[in-house]
Design a protein with these regions (language model features):
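Basic, nucleic-acid-interacting segments
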Residues: 1-293, 304, 308-310, 331-335
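Amphipathic alpha-helical core segments of compact helical bundles
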Residues: 16, 193, 197, 228, ...
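Core structural elements
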Residues: 186-198, 303-327, 336-354, 366-368, ...
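Structural motif
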Residues: 1, 330-339, 377-380, 437-441
Length: 471
């Protein structure tokens, strides 16, 4: 019998706010444990939450980016459960009236993955297990960090579709300016709801939820593993238990954590300390007008205006920084081909050599465009341009200023070039004679001698032209 895998995803993204959703504590990643906390996010008695307006605006922006309907009046609810990383013993979330509904993400195949809803909530803390002394430590810095939970419909049928959906969603949220979606820092986390059923069956099977997926590769492996596990249970006549499972990527397997809760288990009730969230039509229009160009539109424009291929576009779209760098560079240098080459080939090489990531690159986007113009005008050669570009990326150097200070400009004095070429001809009569006898390698040798005599500061085209004329 053939089986069909049915997959739905719950994706949590941390919103790009400077402070937490209900207090003024910073959201900065990587602080000393339990230093970004206050009585509000620790849930101490007598404290009251104050909603972060920026979190609401970013959530609306996310909904608009995914084509969602924006709920004009939404509400918060309390999700009650006990866990050591949840100081209040309840999480403020949205169940009954979420902020965004009915969006979608389109895969490359044209298949539409429906988004059921997006709702705001606060993050929990982080548990760190210490096997050496058998202790579990709690870091509450993450408590109260604003999250947007994006819940898909169970529209995906393979691990590949699920991973593509995650990639498309991450790209959309990053380019919309909603979240940095760094999985390694936990600002994008995905839970997988999965069941299997015989092909042609309408009724869904018993689902399990998979957690601890810290990469797209882990998500793909977990889906394939869980699908195979469930099919094996069915074929052996065993029942599938509705449960939450933890994925161990090193072992390539999952294990049961707890039975899967239903909504009723959390005893939701309306949050009494936060008034309804009202989003007016003018509010929505204002956010729409502030929206940047979204990935699908940007890809289409680059393809139509610049005739860029899919591979170049995919690489440029790997981060909002490189996409913005390309647009700014093309505006200055007017050559999409040159801009794409420098960003897709030279930039990664410089970053690797310096041990940097793209997030570490803080240079002005205008610098590359000006550097390409200096190269195309003959002011510098390509070797010099590469050296200058490395300084731009690693030290935010100004290209024109760096070239001037270090005397890297190419020689433009035709008389000086001619004098140097004449000296080389006089000193290399044998090579000149060989060239005149038809040995082209001798000409390349003479070019090299001329460039050496000029300290590498003359345009190769000018040296070649002068040598041909004088020989």
């Amino acid at each position: 019998m053939r089986y069909e895998t049915v997959i739905g995803l719950e994706v949590h993204i941390e919103l790009l706010t400077e402070t937490k959703i209900f207090c003024s504590c910073p959201t900065e990643f990587g602080g000393e444990p339990n230093t970004h906390v206050c009585p509000v996010c620790l849930g101490l008695p007598g404290t009251l939450p104050t909603l972060n307006k920026k979190a609401v605006e970013l959530s609306v922006r996310a909904g608009l980016a995914a084509g969602c309907e924006i709920t004009r009046i939404s509400r918060f609810d309390r999700k009650n459960y006990f866990y050591p990383d949840l100081p209040k013993a309840y999480q403020i979330s949205q169940l009954y009236l979420p902020l965004c509904r009915n969006g979608s993400v389109t895969l490359d195949s044209g298949k539409i993955i429906r988004i059921k809803e997006m709702h705001m909530e606060e993050d929990a803390g982080k548990l760190m297990h210490s096997p050496d002394d058998n202790r579990t430590l709690i870091d509450c810095n993450r408590c109260g960090v604003p999250l947007l939970e994006i819940v898909s419909e169970p529209d995906m049928r393979s691990a590949e579709e699920a991973v593509e959906y995650l990639e498309k969603l991450r790209e959309l949220m990053r380019f919309a300016g909603v979240s940095d979606c760094r999985m390694q820092e936990g600002s994008l986390r995905a839970d997988i709801n999965l069941s299997v059923r015989p092909e042609g069956e309408i009724e869904l099977g018993t689902r399990t939820e998979m957690k601890n997926l810290n990469s797209f590769r882990a998500a793909e492996r977990a889906i394939k593993s869980e699908s195979a596990r469930q099919i094996s249970l069915i074929e052996n006549g065993e029942n599938i238990i509705q449960e939450t499972r933890r994925w161990d990527d090193d072992a390539g397997m999952s294990y049961a954590m707890r039975s899967k809760e239903d909504t009723s288990d959390y005893k939701y009730f309306p949050e009494p300390d936060i008034p309804p969230v009202v989003v007016s039509t003018p509010d929505i229009e204002k956010i729409k007008n502030q929206m940047p160009e979204l990935p699908q539109a940007k890809r289409r424009r680059w393809s139509e205006e610049y005739n860029l291929g899919r591979a170049d576009i995919d690489t440029l779209m790997s981060s909002p920084f490189t996409a913005d760098l390309f647009d700014r560079t093309v505006m200055l240098c007017k050559s999409a081909k040159d801009a794409a080459s420098w960003i897709n080939v030279e930039l990664p090489a410089v970053l690797r050599g310096a041990g940097m990531s793209i997030e570490d690159a803080k240079f002005s986007p205008d610098s590359l465009g000006r550097l390409i113009n200096m190269l195309s005008s003959g002011e510098i050669n390509r070797g010099t341009a590469k050296k200058v570009f490395a300084k731009i990326v690693t030290e935010n150097a100004d290209p024109a200023e760096y070239v001037r200070k270090n005397g890297l400009s190419l020689m433009t004095d035709a008389a000086a070039i001619e004098d140097a070429v004449k000296r080389v001809i006089a000193e290399n009569e044998k090579s000149v004679s060989q060239y005149r006898d038809g040995k082209t390698q001798a000409f390349q040798y003479l070019i090299g001698q001329c460039m050496r005599a000029l300290g590498g500061k003359a345009p190769a085209s000018a040296v070649t032209e002068t040598l041909k004329r004088l020989i």
